[in-house]
C-alpha cells in the first residue's frame, strides 16, 4: 500500500524516535500538539499566528528537524512528513482528528505538568 512516503528521497530530517521515550521536552511537545497541532494525511503539523513563531522554533529544535517553517496567510506553519515520527505520536495517544481527542494520554505522573504547560501554551 502506498502511503506517500519515500525513504529513499528524504529531503529533510527529524528525530524519528522523539515520541518513543517520556521526557519533559517530549511531553511538552505532545501537550502542545494535542492543543494546536494536527496529524494530516502524510504529516504532523502546526499552524500558528505570527506572534507564536518562537514556539515553532522551539518544537523544531526539540525534534531535531531540518524541515522549514513557512509563512502563509499571516501564520507560520511547520509540517513534518515522517511516518515513524507520526506513528510514535499516535502511540502516545495523539489522534488524527482534534474533535475525537476527548481523553488525555496515559502520562507518567512526573511528566504531567509538562503536558499541561504545552497544552496551555
Model-derived segments and their meaning:
Residues 2-121:
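Intein-associated homing endonuclease modules of the LAGLIDADG/DOD-type, together
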Amino acid at each position: 500500500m502506498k502511503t506517500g512516503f519515500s525513504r529513499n528521497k528524504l529531503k529533510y530530517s527529524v528525530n524519528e524516535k522523539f515520541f518513543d521515550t517520556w521526557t519533559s521536552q517530549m511531553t511538552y511537545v505532545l501537550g502542545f500538539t494535542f492543543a494546536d497541532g494536527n496529524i494530516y494525511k502524510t504529516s504532523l503539523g502546526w499552524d500558528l499566528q505570527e506572534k507564536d513563531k518562537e514556539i515553532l522554533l522551539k518544537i523544531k529544535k526539540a525534534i531535531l528537524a531540518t524541515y522549514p517553517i513557512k509563512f502563509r496567510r499571516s501564520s507560520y506553519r511547520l509540517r513534518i512528513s515522517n511516518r515513524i515520527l507520526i506513528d510514535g505520536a499516535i502511540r502516545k495517544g495523539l489522534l488524527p482528528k482534534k474533535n475525537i481527542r476527548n481523553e488525555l494520554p496515559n502520562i507518567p505522573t512526573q511528566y504531567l505538568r509538562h503536558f499541561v504547560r504545552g497544552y496551555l501554551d
